[in-house]
Amino acid sequence: MSSPSPSSEAAAAHHHHHQRRQHAGAAGGSGLVPLAALIKEEARAERPMGSGSRICARDEEDGGGGGGAEGGRRWRRPLLRYGCAAQSKKGEDFFLLRTDCARPSTSSSSSSSLASSPPHTFAVFAVLDGHNGNAAAIYTRDNLLNHVLSAMPRGLSREEWLHALPRALVAGFVKTDKEFQHKGQTSGTTATFVIIDGWTITVASVGDSRCILDAQGGAVSLLTVDHRLEENVEERERVTASGGEVGRLSVVGGAEIGPLRCWPGGLCLSRSIGDIDVGEFIVPVPYVKQVKLSNAGGRLIIASDGIWDALSSEAAAKCCRGLPAELAAKQVVKEALRTRGLKDDTTCIVVDMIPPDQTIRHPSPPKKINKLKSLIFRKKTKDHPNKLTKQLSAAGMVEELFEEGSAMLSERLGNDSSGRRTSSSLFTCAICQVDLEPSEGISVHAGSIFSSSSSKPWEGPFLCSDCRDKKDAMEGKRPSGVKVL
């Protein structure tokens, strides 16, 4: 799949160089601006997509060739309005704003229909919070999207494309980490990567740069999981089982101070991109969640821990309700600085998904009696079903399509009996996309023949020997000090 050209970016730069565009309707000051007036003005403007801080709503043909409620029908895309604000302390926060990324049409589409139909597009928003330098954050910002798209099969309908996206995100994150580590630089980064296609939101994340959804009616829900060792018991157990040590910093006299860290390295996070000087049990495999909003719309807040160390999810959502996206992002940063001061890089992106054919208010404070006030998505288990997700879904606000947070590549890449053959009948590595002879590919399930899983080690997806070595290291199957470079 061809990747979007850099020249089509709406914005993709460090916050020191980011110049935000402001519409005439919001230029009068920093006070509250009626959303109805903004939408009416933008509807008259009819600017092309990617100009300014919005996406024009329009019909789009699914072209799916059947399957799904939207297959073969035209549907209305939401209007996207976004804003970004940041304050720098260390110069290690970066972000990505792209509103005109293209996915190819299905192979069954005729050339005449392609000429008359609008392009199949999606938007990408990302926050990258670097540590130990900014090299990993910059590299991830510049390469992660291309790596995700290279892992997507060609000729998919929109429904199939969305279904394949979680797996491609896993492959893209791991490839980005692997290629950055080849550079030998020691920095690392969190990554929260949000893809919006129509009303469907797919979020992949490592680290603690959180993404929340503020739905109409005041329901605030998490679309990410924090990979901080201090709060995440499952991640602590995984790291120790893989050969890492978890503890606090020891000072003279034997006292322990600060948050829980992973040793060697002293990192507070259990998942990141980069960090070559830390054990391989610090993995780049992302937590992925995919949801579909109702046409009531909603607001996304994506931010680095400079925000979340100062504000709870509910406080961040509440402090900017009633404001348009650009002012909302500034308000969240302002509130975080007021609460805690500038102790870390602080970055916030706000994205509003607005129905295209009706006047909708920005998310407003909930009523005094509202059972959906603090709905939080939690990881589903057999013993504890996700009742909160069911409540939110029953309210017609959001439909959960996918959720997975396992760090095991064999679980995340699934089964593929075809092995993704290329046109030359070679196999393709599911991570780095290099061509493999049939005798060279190693199944991601190899070594699990006696497990209770239904996976078969002679089936794909397949990995090259380099990616297989990395998989084994991440799962504690070889000494973490032995790096694959």
From Swiss-Prot:
Positions of region (Disordered): 1-29, 43-72
What is the protein's name according to its record? Probable protein phosphatase 2C 3
Carries keyword Hydrolase? yes
Q: Which GO terms describe its molecular function?
A: metal ion binding; protein serine/threonine phosphatase activity
Q: Where is the composition biased (Low complexity)?
A: 1-11
Biased composition annotated in UniProt, kind: Basic residues:
13-23
EC number, UniProt record: 3.1.3.16
Q: According to the UniProt record, what class of enzyme is this?
A: hydrolase
